[in-house]
A protein has these predicted regions:
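Active-site and NAD+-binding cores of ADP-ribose-processing enzymes
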Residues: 1-189
C-alpha cells in the first residue's frame, strides 16, 4: 500500500470514479503533499478564496509502469510509451499494434476535425473515450498504473507520483480542508 495525496477543488465526493476523471487523464493522479498543493494552485490561479481539499489516500498498485513525467504533455508522449511497451510485450503484438494504430489515427485526425471545433462537448467525449481505450490497452499489457518522477508539480524536490487505472485501487483515508491562499503560501515555502 502506498500513501499519497490528491489536491482537488471538488467538495462533492469521498471516493474516486474513473469515469468522472478530468477529461485529459488516462487515470487518477496522486503524489506528494507538495504536488497536491501545487495542483490546487494550478486550478485556481489567483483566486485566494477557493475552498479546496487535500485527500490522503492509500493506493494499491501491483504492477505500475515506470514512465517519464509525460502528463503535462500531449497525447503523443503517451502514445510513444504505449508503442515502446507493445514492442516489449511478451504476447503477440499484432492485436495491440492494430488498436494502437487505430487510436493514433483517430487522435491525429481530431485536431483537424471541424465537428470538434463546432462542438467542444463532442471533443471532450472523444478524449474521454480515447483515455478509456488507452487505459484498457495498458491494462491488457499487464499494468495497473504508472509511477513517475513528478517534475512539474514537485519542482526541484521531484518525487514519485502515481497514476492508477482503476478507482478500486484507491481508498480515501483522510482529508484536510484548505483555503487556496494558505495552500499557496505553504507551497512556496
Amino acid at each position: 500500500t502506498i500513501v499519497a495525496y490528491h489536491g482537488t477543488d471538488r467538495m462533492d465526493f469521498d471516493s474516486f470514479d474513473i469515469a468522472e476523471a478530468r477529461i485529459f487523464n488516462v487515470g487518477l493522479h496522486f503524489g506528494t503533499r507538495a504536488a497536491a498543493q501545487s495542483r490546487i494552485a494550478y486550478l485556481h490561479g489567483e483566486n485566494p478564496s477557493a475552498n479546496c481539499r487535500i485527500l490522503t489516500c492509500e493506493l494499491t498498485l501491483q504492477n505500475p509502469l515506470r514512465v517519464d513525467d509525460i502528463f503535462g504533455h500531449s497525447y503523443a508522449r503517451i502514445f510513444e510509451v504505449l508503442e515502446d511497451e507493445i514492442g516489449r510485450a511478451r504476447t503477440p503484438a499484432a492485436p495491440f499494434r492494430r488498436k494502437y494504430d487505430e487510436l493514433l489515427r483517430r487522435w491525429m485526425n481530431a485536431d483537424d476535425n471541424p465537428r470538434f471545433a463546432k462542438n467542444p462537448s463532442l471533443y471532450f467525449a472523444f478524449n474521454q473515450k480515447l483515455n478509456e481505450e488507452l487505459r484498457h490497452l495498458f491494462q491488457k499489457l499487464g499494468y495497473d498504473g504508472f509511477v513517475y518522477t513528478n517534475e512539474l508539480e514537485d519542482g526541484e524536490s521531484a518525487a514519485d507520483s502515481y497514476c492508477v487505472f482503476d478507482d478500486r485501487q484507491v481508498a480515501v483515508v483522510g482529508e484536510e480542508m484548505v483555503k487556496y491562499g494558505r495552500c499557496r503560501a505553504r507551497c512556496a515555502a
